[in-house]
A protein has these predicted regions:
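N-terminal secretory signal peptides and thylakoid transit peptides that target proteins
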Residues: 2-22, 28
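Caspase-like cysteine protease fold
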Residues: 35-45, 49-51, 234-303
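Active-site-proximal C-terminal subdomain of hydrolase catalytic domains
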Residues: 55, 72, 79-80, 171-267
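Caspase-like (clan CD) cysteine peptidase catalytic core
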Residues: 38-42, 48, 86-88, 98-122, ...
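Short coil/turn linking the two alpha-helices of tandem helical-hairpin repeats
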Residues: 311-312, 349, 399-404, 435-438
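Structural signature of tandem alpha-helical TPR/SEL1-like repeats
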Residues: 367-374, 403-413, 437-445
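Short helix-capping/linker turns of helical repeat alpha-solenoids
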Residues: 330, 385-387, 400, 420-422, ...
Length: 465
């Protein structure tokens, strides 16, 4: 995590004074009444929610990160308001970090299958040999790769894959960590990942980019500040997956309009890997949201939102989302409509790129897959700019091989996923064209994958060439 330079007091003062952008100021408040006390909420809700927050600020000079305790403190408060039972740990060394993780994983294993589990890390993060490492307190981020590899927590192997899979539940992993190498010439940033089924992974910025941390203890990082603000203020009906898209937009716009040029130059565009299936709203299951006065157009509002929900083709998504926001600007569904509109616009832009050969007919569900809920879900999400959904559809097309144009559809969906920022899809295209004896295309797509911040594991990179 990059730290704003404390040797420039003017820059520090500007960063302290800057608030988050007002892009989402028009969204409706989370509740019509004050939130319930967290103890009352836990007694009333039917959904089990567990969270572990790990934050490390104490690293060898000059790598300390003063804002991390505030990050953890503020996020804990808002998560408890959202019905989570929260554990936190600050500045643990490697043994302490592993013990903390083991305790949380044991609690997760004992939780119901439909529980919501959340893991958050804020501190330094490094990529070594394509593996994403979370550095414990006291470990020098500029150390040798072998030292970092042996002295860190592996995000995927030690955290994500050890949390028991959910059936009807959701796992959320949030990493607000350094995204650029702290050694010249080393691999840059954390690596792109594929989230396991029923899991969402959010990084505070894209591969090869720094996540900015103030040099003072009374300011949060941009990403966590936005996450806390929007988790507290966004409507109860908002899905967690939509929340992270709202945070992504808010952080980017806030930093792009920051008065400090260096901050504008480092504007973060968070990475999100989403393989969730269950509905998971900010309000826990079993909690009735505070009802406002009955509105005369409530029935029409629900009909209009259903029409938006049913839309698949990106142009239809944008049109219906725009109409919904104009007709119902204060609706509790407004955050979801905003995410749909922005995502549909991204999908349309990607489909217009010259290298993407995918057409409207590809968004029509084949008869053989008419009852496939996963395929239906991914078609809807791809039409809203979901890079991971597009990549999953590509794999479905590849596995079918029972239609004359399966290969064209496979390539087209991977091309769309790549255009939406999926570096792993770009690398899959490189491998595909290599297998088709098209070395020029293979080289082009491999270069694209690396530009997007994806580093293939050494075994895959070396063996499959």
């Amino acid at each position: 995590m990059s730290k704003t330079d404390s040797s420039h007091p003017g820059r520090r003062q500007l960063l302290q004074a800057a608030g988050l952008g007002s892009l989402l100021a028009a969204l409706p408040p989370a509740r019509a009444a004050a939130p319930a006390e967290s103890g009352d909420l836990l007694q009333a809700q039917s959904e089990v929610r567990l969270a572990l927050l790990m934050g490390n600020s104490e690293y060898p000079a000059p790598f300390d990160l003063p804002p991390i305790p505030k990050n953890v403190h503020d996020l804990r408060y808002v998560l408890e308001q959202r019905g989570f039972v929260v554990s936190d740990a600050l500045n643990g060394n490697l043994p302490a970090s592993r013990k903390t993780l083991d305790d949380f994983i044991a609690k997760a294993a004992a939780a119901p299958a439909d529980a919501t589990l959340l893991f958050y890390f804020s501190g330094h993060g490094i990529q070594v040999d394509a593996s994403n490492l979370l550095l414990p307190a006291g470990l020098d981020p500029s150390g040798k790769p072998d030292t970092l590899r042996g002295g860190s927590v592996k995000l995927i192997d030690d955290v994500i894959l050890k949390i028991p899979p959910r059936k009807g539940g959701t796992i959320v992993a949030i990493v607000d960590a350094c995204r650029t190498s702290l050694k010249a010439g080393a691999d840059g940033g954390l690596n792109q990942v594929v989230a396991p089924a029923d899991c969402l992974i959010a990084f505070s910025t894209g591969a090869g980019r720094p996540a900015v941390a103030p040099a003072v203890a009374d300011r949060s990082t941009f990403y966590t500040a936005s996450l806390v603000k929007l988790m507290e203020s966004t409507s109860d009906q908002t899905q967690f997956r939509d929340l992270f898209q709202l945070v992504r937009t808010d952080v980017r716009e806030t930093m792009l309009h920051h008065p400090v040029e260096a901050i504008r130059r480092l504007a973060q565009d968070s990475f999100i890997a989403d393989s969730t299936r269950a509905s998971c709203t900010l309000a826990p299951r079993g909690i009735a949201t505070a009802a406002g006065p009955a509105l005369p157009d409530a029935e029409q509002e629900e009909q209009d939102f259903q029409a938006l929900t049913d839309a698949v083709w990106p142009a239809d998504v944008v049109e219906r989302a725009d109409a919904f926001l104009k007709a119902h600007p204060k609706s509790a569904h407004a955050p979801a409509a905003m995410v749909a509109k922005n995502g549909g616009a991204e999908a349309l832009k990607a489909l217009r790129r010259r290298e993407v050969r995918l057409f409207k007919t590809a968004f029509d569900l084949p008869a053989a897959l008419a009852t496939d809920e996963d395929m239906q879900r991914d078609l809807h999400r791809a039409g809203r700019g979901d890079k991971d959904a597009a990549a999953r559809i590509a794999q479905i097309q590849r596995n079918r091989r029972d239609t004359a144009n399966w290969m064209n559809r496979y390539e087209g969906w991977l091309q769309l996923a790549s255009a939406l920022g999926n570096g792993i899809a770009s690398y899959d295209l490189a491998l595909h064209y290599r297998s088709q004896n098209q070395p020029l295309l293979s080289s082009q797509w491999e270069s694209r994958a690396r530009e997007q911040g994806y580093t293939p594991p050494p075994s895959l990179d070396n063996v499959r060439k």
